[in-house]
Design a protein with these regions (language model features):
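A short beta-sheet element
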Residues: 48, 69-137, 147-149, 154-155
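Low-complexity, Lys/Gly-biased intrinsically disordered segments
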Residues: 15-60, 69-78, 95, 146
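C-terminal hydrophobic structural anchor segments
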Residues: 131, 139, 162-166
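A generic structural signal for short beta-strands and their flanking turns/coil linkers
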Residues: 43, 63, 110-113
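Short, charged, solvent-exposed linker or helix-capping segments at domain edges/interfaces
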Residues: 58-60, 129, 173
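Non-catalytic DNA-recognition/assembly elements of restriction-modification systems
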Residues: 1-36, 41, 160, 164, ...
Length: 215
């Protein structure tokens, strides 16, 4: 997907393409604040930068923090929650690590450390995501960072980034190709998740002798 994106939208980019600010193409925001007293032992995973980085690298993560299902539903009903195609990006300390939310994901996240890209207007999130993780996107992020002791990306800074808009027919064809790739990746992640759960269930039983392998 990254190779396809680079060829279509960077190497073959046309100077005549319309240029807009990122803030005009989508909503850039953060989450509602969750307080320490609201953490629970199980429920809906609550992600920080650490978990988003793990998801980006491996496709899975083990959440250490949770909020209750009731609190999550309350927030989701009033303000929304990350859904398929949305993008979360690390914005404090480790900058610019982006993760595109999958259909199977259900979680909430820490305000301040992560920035939420949603409500894409006429431009698929797949294109924005691959631009963010491309060299040209990372250079744009580098140019707007603030701070010296602890670097950060601000919502206003992200909104100000210029973005070239490919022609509609180019976007539609790319989105079709991209979705095929994403479906394959999602299938592989589900397979890995199933096998991991099976391993975690069977291994203790094998070690304790509860389950025996004949042969």
């Amino acid at each position: 997907a990254e190779t396809l994106f680079r060829q279509w939208f960077i190497e073959d980019a046309d100077e005549s393409w319309e240029e807009k600010k990122l803030g005009d193409l989508l909503t850039i925001t953060s989450s509602k604040r969750i307080f320490y007293s609201e953490y629970v032992k199980s429920g809906i995973p609550f992600y920080r930068s650490k978990e988003i980085i793990e998801l980006r690298k491996t496709g899975s993560t083990n959440s250490e923090l949770y909020i209750s299902n009731e609190r999550f539903r309350e927030i989701k009903d009033k303000f929304g929650s990350p859904k398929e195609g949305d993008i979360l990006m690390t914005s404090v300390g480790t900058l610019g690590v982006a993760y595109r939310v999958r259909k199977s994901d259900e979680f909430y996240f820490k305000d301040g450390n992560l920035t939420w890209f949603k409500d894409f207007k006429g431009l698929p999130s797949s294109i924005v995501y691959l631009w963010l993780i491309s060299n040209i996107g990372q250079e744009a992020l580098e140019s707007i960072k603030i701070g010296s002791t602890q670097e950060a990306l601000t919502i206003e800074g992200l909104k100000s980034i210029s973005f070239k808009i490919p022609p509609k027919e180019c976007i539609e064809q790319y989105e079709y190709e991209f979705q095929i790739i994403i479906n394959k990746i999602e299938f592989n992640h589900n397979q890995i998740r199933t096998l991991t759960q099976l391993r975690d269930t069977l291994l203790p039983k094998l070690m304790s002798g509860e389950v025996r392998v004949e042969g």
